[in-house]
Amino acid sequence: MPRICAGPPSRGTPRWVKIWIAVWKNRLKPYDLLSKDEVNTIHEQAMTILEEIGVDFLHDGARELFEKAGMRVEENRVRFERAFVLEQVARAPATFELQARNASRTVTLGGDNVVTAPVYGPPFVTDLERGRRGATIEDFTNFDKMSQAVEQIHCAGGTTVEPEDLPLGTRHLDMVYSHLRWTDKPFMGSVISTEGARDTIEMASIALGGRDKIEKTPAIISLINVNSPLRYDDRMLGALFEYSQAGQPVIVTPFLMAGAMSPMGLAGTVAQQTAEALAGIALVQLIRPGTPSVYGSFLTNTDMQSGSPAFGTPESAMGILASAQMARHYKLPFRGGGALTSSKAPDAQAAYESMMCMWPTILGRVNFVLHAAGWLESALLASYEKFIIDVEQLRMFEWILGHGLPVDEEGLAMDALREVGPGGHFLGAEHTMRHYRTGFYRPWISSTENFDRWQRFGSRTTEVVAAERWKQLLAEYPDPGIDPGVDEELKTFIARRKTEIGADA
């Protein structure tokens, strides 16, 4: 639940000013891009796709479960009965808790809750001084520490960057350890393999009090990507089985670039996405009924001149809104949106493309916002400065959701209107004196000073200020600590698993 900042309010703080620092509640009315008839039309097409075309599952266990449930299975292809799909999807809870190592950081997904997480997946990182380079485990840990340090990030994320200085076969152990040691927030599990998922579950069990405890209240959320169009590969399905059997939430996310991996028509793309997501969620429920399942969306268009994905486009924005509406139709928590951009630098393009994705994220009532901070270059690049700039944007949305527009005695300020009257000004009014410190949003890095003052203090651009801020965050990082016995048990487990896997795997 959201918390009001601890301690007494500062002098002049009105009762209606709330500082939301744990998780967001989005009480804005969701924006419906589609009519009810259009939602039903897309639903019908999704069901037709599942019935007539089907979905490939490159995993023996998945096909066996579907065949046992009465679905038509031919080689890798599974064709579904719509009643079966809808029955299974209805087993997934509309809301669920995701526990953190620190109980006060536990979050709720679904409903009007908004949970944010940083960038996921880039093999490269950049900062103002060192430029673009391959990511390392030091970078990974730094992003964990920055995520811990800012209240606007609620989940530490998963593969914030790919630490290329570590062996591929064992790096997931170091990454999960970083999440558990340097943050006390919820985190995302490894999906690189069946074994990676199994190791994640074991490490979370060590850190959070045992397998029984995390099965009772989930502690790991994982990102299961569909190999669109209409195919699940064995690696993702192996991870899906492990997490589902343990009752850990999965975000089933088709990766759709309209024009390449889905039709040019955006409505057809949303229908394909719905079919793919519901097929995966049906499998999760077959494995363990009631396992939390999230309808995920990663939908944008292809630049038809270059073949590259394009982010922060009108299609991205409409895709977020339409996808969120479909998730609400099935009463499922929804993942989508984020501060997405195709820009290679934290520049004006990055800013307007990110905002083009973040506004529909908020208006569409997205529940889990992956890539909320740090994303550049179509997910190839994580930027220290972009992380900070995105957090400023998150702070603004946090203010809108937490502060709102109070229509009460203080918000209407009739006393100030009477005091000032025609032709006056409100700078010295009693109402202004009560609220001037806390009544408006105060920027974290943005400049609102006049030109002379800005020039006198170095004419610093936003990127320069952001570089100073991330260094300050790391220098002042609030270490959450960890029980020494738990830490030792985690390190022992990691050492054993690295020996079993092989250091050069």
What are these regions (language model features)?
Residues P2-W16:
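Histidine-centered active-site loop/cap adjacent to the catalytic His
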Residues R11, D37, T41, F57, ...:
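Conserved active-site and cofactor/substrate-binding residues in soluble primary-metabolism enzymes
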Residues R11-G12, K18-D127, R469:
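N-terminal leader/transition segments
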Residues I19, L33-Q45, I53, L58-L65, ...:
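Catalytic-core signal marking the mid-to-C-terminal active-site face
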Residues I21-N26, E67-G70, A219, M257, ...:
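Short acidic (Asp/Glu) and glycine-rich catalytic loops that position anionic groups and cofactors
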Residues R79-P254, A258-P263, A267:
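Catalytic alpha/beta active-site cores
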Residues L223-Q393:
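Glycine-rich anion/phosphate-binding loop at the beta-strand->alpha-helix junction
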